[in-house]
Amino acid sequence: MSNENKVLKLGLPKGSLQDSTIDLFAQAGFHFSVQSRSYFPSIDDDELEAILIRAQEMAHYVELGAFDVGLTGKDWIIETDADVVEVADLVYSKASMRPVRWVLCVPESSSIQSVKDLEGKHIATEVVNITKKYLAQHGVNASVEFSWGATEVKPPDLADAIVEVTETGTSLRANKLRIIDTLLESNTKLIANRQSWEDPWKREKIENMAMLLLGAINAHGKVGLKMNAPKASLEKLMSIIPALRQPTISALADAEWVALEVIVTEKIVRKLIPELKRAGAEGIFEYNINKLID
């Protein structure tokens, strides 16, 4: 088959990760258009076909070969015991660029203080297998029931405790729940079907995708700064710039001046630019970075 006819089947997570995933792909250079009620986004790449599916099911379908590649959480790979290639760690979630946690929670008023106190108790969760393994590791015999959602409202009437995912802890606190322990820290992963990974064309396509997605994540919260400065001010400027890497210094037509370019975290720029100006920099301008590839 010629490369012109080859297509990589991509599974995108539907639900809480959908918007942040579409945004991440856009920053990486892949632009999806998702129509209302449609599970088949269009994309500006003729070599890709995408389908939206729940992250909980993604690893299973990638293992079966329904998708060549997909995005899901480390948690769901473990929960479904899927045999897939873990291509890249993509540390982002619904509302932030950090991992999520699966935590054991009880009502604030509960007398339960540790996992040992759950002997003979009832636990509700979406991650039944992860929870059962955790209890077994602690030698605790408790009932674990699958929860179809709204897990946080189940204690104390419908469950003694829950195992629930949290990003910030805000929802747990709002429901007056107290965290006893963390079972698992999880982040999004790019995964591939093992047979697809052995196909040279598909593997290169997947590896290129991984590189661009990681570059987009690495660029998060960072900007570039360019400026001109007299050589006499260079030492002082270098002491001010908190660079992720050494600044790039280029010669200018005027032998007494140089151009500097540097990547910094965006949150410090409002303080940094006035300091650079006072130290002798001129023509300072800031630009956004879509991808930062090591």
From Swiss-Prot:
EC numbers: 2.4.2.17
A Gene Ontology cellular-component term: cytoplasm
Catalytic activity, as annotated: 1-(5-phospho-beta-D-ribosyl)-ATP + diphosphate = 5-phospho-alpha-D-ribose 1-diphosphate + ATP
Entry's Gene Ontology BP terms: L-histidine biosynthetic process
A Pfam family it matches: HisG
Claim: Repeat is one of the keywords in the record: no
Cofactor: Mg(2+)
UniProt keyword annotation of Metal-binding present: yes
Source domain of life: Bacteria
Intracellular or extracellular location(s): Cytoplasm
Control of this protein's activity: Feedback inhibited by histidine.
Task of the protein: Catalyzes the condensation of ATP and 5-phosphoribose 1-diphosphate to form N'-(5'-phosphoribosyl)-ATP (PR-ATP). Has a crucial role in the pathway because the rate of histidine biosynthesis seems to be controlled primarily by regulation of HisG enzymatic activity.
Name of this protein: ATP phosphoribosyltransferase
Gene coding for it: hisG
